[in-house]
A protein has these predicted regions:
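A short His-aromatic
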Residues: 71-72
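C-terminal lobe and adjacent flexible extensions of AdoMet/dcAdoMet transferase-like proteins
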Residues: 158-206
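A short glycine-rich, Lys/Arg-flanked "PGG" loop and its adjoining helix->strand segment in the class I
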Residues: 77-92
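A short acidic, Gly/Pro-enriched loop at the edge of an enzyme's catalytic core
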Residues: 52-63
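Class I SAM-dependent methyltransferase SAM/SAH-binding core
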Residues: 9-53
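Single conserved hydrophobic/aromatic residue that forms the stacking wall/gate
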Residues: 1-8
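SAM-dependent methyltransferase
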Residues: 94-166
């Protein structure tokens, strides 16, 4: 999220105007509250949109995407094309993604249980090799209220060559890719990519 405490304070000092995008109205409300706490409301536009149908009404100079957003999108090529369409020449695109290693070897067909004082969580995974995606089921029980939360979603697996090709196809130069947890060089067991790409030309003329 662009408005995590550290990033929000940095953007506030630098005077950036920001656009926050999510399909969830609930998440946008959380960001709106955070923006008010940081005094950023006047420089923040929140849009409820699908990244596959993006319309920003103008150009941008940078984009930041975290928490594996692009793994949740079945059409990576279109999502990157949309980001590129609205970005000015020289614009910076920063984003992270889970690696094939994490999907296949760490999540795989494994289940994880987490116990906290106020809640317990069971996270189940199934790797669908034919469709190259992880099918994930999350169940959370809140001890005090007895409330139960259930969610099912997929993460799609994209290898480095596919991501690089999509970036280059849509006008980006891949400046660097590193381990998204250590920020050191990638290894065979890296679980997260972190990408820095720059746009080579402007497509949308205002």
């Amino acid at each position: 999220c662009l408005l995590s405490r550290g990033l929000g304070d940095v953007y506030k000092r630098q005077g950036y105007d920001m656009i926050g995008i999510d399909q969830s109205e609930e998440m946008l409300c959380v960001v709106r509250d955070k923006a008010e706490q940081l005094g950023l409301s006047g420089r923040l536009l929140l849009l409820r949109q699908d990244l596959l149908k993006l319309d920003l009404y103008g150009t941008i100079r940078a984009a930041v995407s975290t928490f594996d957003t692009f793994n949740h999108i079945p059409d990576l090529d279109t999502a990157i094309a949309n980001a590129g369409f609205f970005m000015e020449k020289g614009g910076v695109f920063l984003f992270d993604m889970n690696t094939p290693y994490k999907h296949q070897k760490v999540l795989g067909d494994n289940a994880f249980t987490f116990e906290e004082e106020d809640a317990s969580c069971v996270w189940r995974n199934h790797y669908n090799a034919a469709d190259r995606k992880v099918e994930i089921t999350v169940d959370i029980d809140y001890h005090e209220t007895g409330e139960h939360f259930h969610e099912e979603f997929c993460e799609y697996t994209y290898d480095l060559a596919t991501i690089r090709a999509a970036l280059e196809k849509h006008g980006f130069a891949l400046e660097s890719v590193c381990d998204g947890e250590t920020f050191g060089p990638l290894t065979e067991e890296s679980q997260r990519y972190f990408f820095c790409a720059t746009k080579q030309y402007t497509q949308l003329e205002e």
